């Protein structure tokens, strides 16, 4: 059935295959992993080329093939042929001129390619399905899908239902055109909207036996080459416009340098186009006659893709970050990937139930994209390793708002999170004190730092006299912070200051009814406040602050107030 343009992917060994480290696997596991990923890619190929479905984004598919190619280089048992993308995609109809592929060059290689050539032109790389149009005496004789580049399916009947494909030319010419059928889009910005599923829509329509008038009108045509047309690009474009293919001239621009190419690439990426595009195509105006073309990447044209919107990352481990309130957040530790000039090595999953529903394990490959252009997020699980590594999950019952006031192996995450909050702007606002500071101090309890003097600080690795003096000054300032600020820093529940604050001894004597009498404090809030102020560890911290001379923790004269 359908055969589209994904087959160009393996024509250039890309950065993943060159730079990604080899997995630390025994040969037996390497063979199993290679076979499993190879089978998955073959299934994607079949869905894409033969069923008209696109179960995975092109950029992720490319990265999966690149990774498989890297594994093939890494392990002797995996040195078997890579899956052939076009297996079974060839149709019964021979192309009069083979459909060539395109090498995809990265930013570094594109400058060298341009610098060694002249008579260059640039076009948007329209994201649709490729087609060959054959005209006899000016009438549409045949439309052929790309297939394997040599043979494709007969799309003639469906092509005649497309208003964008002229069934009769202004002149009685015999000619062969190659182009792209695309889904018409309004107000489409590639940088904002991505592919928008446009290619899959065209593929699905062309797989049907009948098209409605509405569906047919939604499909456009961009002719990107006339293999046996006039020798010069200018003349080819001029004649194509005269024949009714005006888009060819409108979207083909001469360039003289990589700077001009970059400008057009950015322009088409960030400005409105009537179609989706996944990069640009650079062509030499002069190229061999069509009789010499082959179904492989030519030397006279290359593709320069837009920046990837998704990266395919290998999960190295599943960690669990525990916040100061005891919330457990699964974090995938990734083999580092680059996305939009950012190096990404971790991505949070939100919650343990989310992780369990996804069942992500080490060795799996996941799609990562940037949310709001800054925060990496997991988009989907693309491929699961056949080796389902066990993952040790923290017990949710062990972590809550009143756990981990002291350092221990199982409490390290929450304990450090408490310290980070304590010194932050929301807490005591200690200048120059942050997570890095706390991790360098040998603390067993949350407030042990109050007892460290300058000499003790200076004796610690990485802390010199100047830094020790800075820390001592910050710690001294903490003693002067008011009670309200200290309670916020210790993590007191909301409502602790409702109706005004007494001293610490009065707060820890309050009962549930006392809290309920405070404005804005309901039953749940009263329960949380009572649990906090009556907790033995919290009361121990209060005594420690009393001994340190912090003002709000000293008893006031007179009877306590409720």
Swiss-Prot record:
Summary of the function given for this chain in its UniProt record: Catalyzes the formation of phosphodiester linkages between 5'-phosphoryl and 3'-hydroxyl groups in double-stranded DNA using NAD as a coenzyme and as the energy source for the reaction.
Record GO terms (molecular function): DNA ligase (NAD+) activity
**What is the protein's given name?**
DNA ligase B
Q: Report the HAMAP family cross-referenced here.
A: DNA_ligase_B
Provide the species name: Ectopseudomonas mendocina (strain ymp) (Pseudomonas mendocina)
Gene3D superfamilies in the cross-refs: DNA ligase/mRNA capping enzyme (3.30.470.30), Helix hairpin bin (1.10.287.610), Nucleic acid-binding proteins (2.40.50.140)
Q: Which family does it belong to?
A: Belongs to the NAD-dependent DNA ligase family. LigB subfamily.
PANTHER family for the chain: DNA LIGASE (PTHR47810), DNA LIGASE B (PTHR47810:SF1)
Q: Which InterPro entries match?
A: DNA_ligase_B, DNA_ligase_CS, DNAligase_adenylation, DNAligase_N, NA-bd_OB-fold, NAD_dep_DNA_ligaseB, NAD_DNA_ligase_OB, RuvA_2-like
For biological process, the GO terms are:
DNA repair; DNA replication
EC top class, as a word: ligase
Enzyme Commission (EC) number:
6.5.1.2
- The answer to whether keyword Transmembrane applies is no
Q: Which domain of life is it from?
A: Bacteria
Keywords carried by this UniProt record: DNA damage, DNA repair, DNA replication, Ligase, NAD
Q: Which gene encodes it?
A: ligB
Q: From the UniProt record, list the reaction(s) this protein catalyses.
A: NAD(+) + (deoxyribonucleotide)n-3'-hydroxyl + 5'-phospho-(deoxyribonucleotide)m = (deoxyribonucleotide)n+m + AMP + beta-nicotinamide D-nucleotide
Q: Entry's PROSITE patterns? A: DNA_LIGASE_N2 (PS01056)
For this protein, the record's Pfam families field holds: DNA_ligase_aden, DNA_ligase_OB
Q: Where is the chain membrane-spanning? A: none
Active site location: 125 (n6-amp-lysine intermediate)
Q: Which residues form a coiled coil?
A: none
